[in-house]
Amino acid sequence: KDFKLNTQCSAGNGYFLQSTCVGFGFDVKEYADLAFAAKAMPMFGYGCAVFMQSDIVDFQRQGWQPEEIMAGLANVLPKNIWLYVSQIPNLASLGRTFILQGGTQHNLAAVKAQVDFIASRFKDKGTKPNVIVHEHCGESGAIGAALEVRRLYGRGQRTKFIGFEAVEKIRYLTHRNENTRCYFCKNKCMRTFIDVQI
């Protein structure tokens, strides 16, 4: 089966940056160089990528250039991650060391924005954060999952996977109505809830 990453949710920040870059006619590998070349950038509000997509259109109408818009998107990325998705405004409460992971960290504009944002959250804390980009940032999630499986297997825990034949027989119901509407931001998106019956 084909799987398509969600192109709208802010949890998919890397894909959003990539699709914006490609939409402007550039290869994603050019993103950082283009963003760093910008002399100014528009200020995006953080939150839902659907809303940010409409901001892109508005900024284009106002005359902002693609590289300036891409710089603005990279700049707002940490706010989406820490304030919108994770909802952790006090980063110092997590400790001093931050390891950035995920394929987005191949984009140096995104990395710089993360480092700057994290450092800004330590400004009056009397200490500085230690920000590290994982050596295998694009694969770090899979590496972590494999290490966790090995740890659990070593403790005698076995899989609860029901098998592919049983998976094909799973029944589910979807619900999409006013009761599933999200009020987390001003967009008030309609969500689909899926109830799985095994």
Regions inferred by a protein language model and the residue ranges of each:
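Glycine-rich phosphate-binding loop plus the immediately following alpha-helix
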Residues: 2-40, 147, 151, 196-197
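Short beta-alpha connecting loops at secondary-structure transitions
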Residues: 2-7, 96, 120-134, 177-178
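Active-site nucleophile and cofactor-binding loops and adjacent substrate-binding regions
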Residues: 4-12, 72-75, 99-105, 130-142
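Glycine-rich phosphate-binding/hydrolytic loop that grips phosphoryl groups
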Residues: 14-22, 132-164
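Conserved ATP-utilizing enzyme core subdomain
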Residues: 27-60, 75, 184-192
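Adenine-nucleotide phosphate-binding core of ATP-dependent small-molecule kinases
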Residues: 54-84
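Glycine-rich phosphate-binding loops at beta-strand->alpha-helix junctions
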Residues: 76, 89-121, 136-138
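Acidic, glycine/GT-rich loop-and beta-edge segments that sit at the periphery of enzyme/chaperone cores
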Residues: 148-198
